[in-house]
Amino acid sequence: MIVRTTDEITGTERDVAGPGWRSKRIVLGGDGVGFSFHETTIDAGTTHEFHYVHHIEAVWLVEGEGTLTDLDNDQVYDLRPGTMYLLNGHEKHRVQARTTMRMMCVFNPPVTGQEVHDENGVYPLVAVPAS
């Protein structure tokens, strides 16, 4: 059994931030459970483009409001607490935060914690070390 709090993750290597966002990576590939689980915060007034070509991501919005745009077909979705979106087709997408948004995110395959978005918003596929 694994039990963690966001307080114990804050300020560690599992607490990752970039311009306009912060991700507390609660479960990572090294935990050996087949997925990773993150609490991600996106700052109000920011826009981010992502394209997870190697991962499927599920996102559950728990706080804030914004929009999600599927960049393959320009369809726009409103985001508010209680909204879930699943990028099961590896869709290139844009997230715009009207207010600060807090989301719970699941990645499969799991991220290791070492990934950094490249210039196209892509995480590389990083092998999970054998434990």
Curated annotation (Swiss-Prot):
Keyword annotations for this protein, in alphabetical order, are: Lyase
Q: Which CDD domains match?
A: cupin_EctC
Known EC number? 4.2.1.108
Q: A GO molecular-function term, please? A: ectoine synthase activity
Under catalytic activity, the entry for this protein gives: (2S)-4-acetamido-2-aminobutanoate = L-ectoine + H2O
InterPro entries linked to this entry: Ectoine_synth, RmlC-like_jellyroll, RmlC_Cupin_sf
Pathway, per record: Amine and polyamine biosynthesis; ectoine biosynthesis; L-ectoine from L-aspartate 4-semialdehyde: step 3/3
Q: What does this protein do?
A: Catalyzes the circularization of gamma-N-acetyl-alpha,gamma-diaminobutyric acid (ADABA) to ectoine (1,4,5,6-tetrahydro-2-methyl-4-pyrimidine carboxylic acid), which is an excellent osmoprotectant.
Q: Which family does it belong to?
A: Belongs to the ectoine synthase family.
Name of this protein: L-ectoine synthase
Q: Which organism is it from?
A: Nocardia farcinica (strain IFM 10152)
Q: What is the lineage of its organism?
A: Bacteria, Bacillati, Actinomycetota, Actinomycetes, Mycobacteriales
